[in-house]
Amino acid sequence: MNKTLSISVASHGFETLASESLRLVLDYLTIYEQFALLSSNKELLNREPLASVVVSYCERCSACRKRTEHLCTNKFKHQTKDFWTALLQYSNPTGLVELRLASCDGFDSDVLKSSQAKAAFMSLQVLELNKCSTMNAEALGLIADMCSTLKELRLRDLAVDPVALNKLITKNAESLRVVDLLGCHTIRGEDIRTLAQCSQLRDLSLWGCHNVDNASIEHVIQHCSQLERLNLRYAHKVDDKVVASIALHLKELKDLNLRYCYKVSDKGVASLCESLPRLRSLNLSQCARLTDAAIMRVATSMTCLKELRLWGCIKLTSNSVLSISEGLPELTLLDLRGRDKFEAVIGGPTALKFLIETYRSKLARWEQAQGEQMGVFKRPSMIAAAA
């Protein structure tokens, strides 16, 4: 695979193992060691795929833990076209099931034109392309031509070709459950309308898709009524009308992110409170128009909330904090980060300490969360009980 293999493998006995048992062995090996083992026996090489799941980043280093997988250098970031072509070739006969790539410059349209690519992609269920600069219109179009069983489609920080995106969504409309378009700033409203075909979609992220118009978002919402998670963070055109549409059509919603949707007001939050009492996670950070009235409404109606984020809601006062503590018994995380929160909302660190000490019983032992930024609070006793 375009790399000198320094190990010698005796394959005696491995060919007698069932595929499931052999896979347990292979999962302990690096991709090069797997290839060495399989290629030592022609029967094994023809029978077993080199890998059905390929992730280019390690998922363990500091870059991966910070969700900046494109900075990970521990696995396949700098591999050549020959490496990727060989990987596709030896992923057969079963082909790939999951492919997650972050900033892999060697993976391009030439690799996708290889004779092995079609069979490798035929059964693909999960596709993630994160900051892959080689994924131009041609490359994404080639992938779209080969995929028809996708359950998850994650295109992150890419200049996505609208024709290829349309084809990807249309060909996989019946199977898609997750669509994540985080940071795809070039996407416009007409580019996402095809999502209305995905009637079984459960998770949709348009985080940072600020060129998408409200009418297109509403169109998708009206046709994707099974959504359980919706992320509109930094989709700053979103207003109360869109939020009302969310409340009307998405009765299964459990997680809603409206961070920096600064046109949303108390009216929009009221519509959520009326129609989505079972919401579990709500992010209203930087929705600067919100007042105590909206948060008090949340506290009295959304009794199933476990996470509430209000960072940057500068009109709120300590009355909101008290109403949250008194009315949200399931809440385990409250995000009030930022100097603006301490100074404008709580009144500074001293006032916060006084508030917690004075209302200790009502605040149910709220404490600064370990490993979180200052201003993110958790209820330790409730977390321990839940565990």
PLM region spans:
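N-terminal adaptor-interaction module of cullin-RING ubiquitin ligase components
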Residues: 1-144, 151-155, 162-169, 173, ...
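CRL adaptor-proximal regions
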Residues: 1-16, 340, 370-387
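Amphipathic alpha-helical interface elements that mediate macromolecular binding in regulatory proteins
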Residues: 15, 19-23, 42, 141, ...
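Short loop/helix-cap segments at secondary-structure boundaries that form the rim of catalytic
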Residues: 47, 195, 345-349
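Leucine-rich repeat
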Residues: 49-52, 66-70, 90-98, 106, ...
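Short, solvent-exposed loop/turn at the beta-strand->alpha-helix junction
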Residues: 76-84, 105-113, 133-141, 158-166, ...
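Leucine-rich solenoid repeat scaffolds
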Residues: 316-375
